[in-house]
A protein has these predicted regions:
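Acidic/aromatic-lined carbohydrate-recognition and catalytic surfaces
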Residues: 1-111, 115, 128-190
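Hydrophobic residues within beta-strands of alpha/beta enzymes
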Residues: 121-123
Length: 190
């Protein structure tokens, strides 16, 4: 933090603005939240997307959803005895935005960095914030014959759900109110 504060002060002296990368979709599997969620410790139990085995699917996978980086988007946790969802790598479990506590956590994170003097945020992986709560299988796209390739499926249940706009509006409104509309910028990946 000391390094960041020194860099921030040096940037201000030069009239530069600081925009941080903000990835609200997932955390590391080593993050305290995930470790506690995996152990079913409250209030973190539902901070991530956990599902039981579905014995009607190969490998017991909850459904056919694919990771952006190939293969199933589900990883088995021996500790919890359930699968967790990851749109990207298994080391990056997706946060559960259907849990209101996650929304509050994101506001706390933005608040922390605004208080540290950040001038804006570039939000990454935004279209991946919500998934179909019914876990419906995604349809085959016809774009490739490789069933491990992300493009094998049409991502109608894991990408750009209408609720994404609601979350973006909530976060943007928080930043606007917090800063009095002073020009802290929010950029989102589309």
């Amino acid at each position: 933090m000391e390094d960041f504060e020194m860099m921030s002060a040096a940037a201000r002296e030069r009239g530069l603005k600081i925009i941080m990368d903000f990835v609200p979709n997932h955390s590391s599997e080593e993050h305290d939240w995930f470790v506690a969620s995996e152990a079913r410790e409250e209030p973190f139990t539902d901070y991530y997307i956990w599902r039981d085995r579905n014995e009607s699917n190969p490998g017991g996978l909850p459904n056919n959803w694919l990771s952006v980086f190939r293969g199933s988007a589900w990883e088995w946790s021996e500790t919890r005895g359930q699968f967790y969802y990851h749109a990207f790598t298994k080391e990056q479990p997706d946060l559960n935005y259907r849990n209101p506590a996650i929304r509050q956590e994101m506001i706390h994170i933005l608040n922390f960095w605004i208080d540290k003097g950040v001038d804006g945020f570039r939000m990454d992986a935004v279209p991946f914030l919500f998934e179909d709560p019914s876990l419906r299988d995604e349809p085959v796209s016809g774009k490739t014959d490789d069933p491990e390739d992300y493009n094998y499926l049409s991502h109608i249940y894991t990408w750009n759900f209408p609720e994404v706009k609601t979350i973006l509006a909530e976060l943007t409104e928080f930043v606007h109110v917090k800063t009095g509309g002073s020009g802290v910028v929010m950029l989102g990946q589309s």
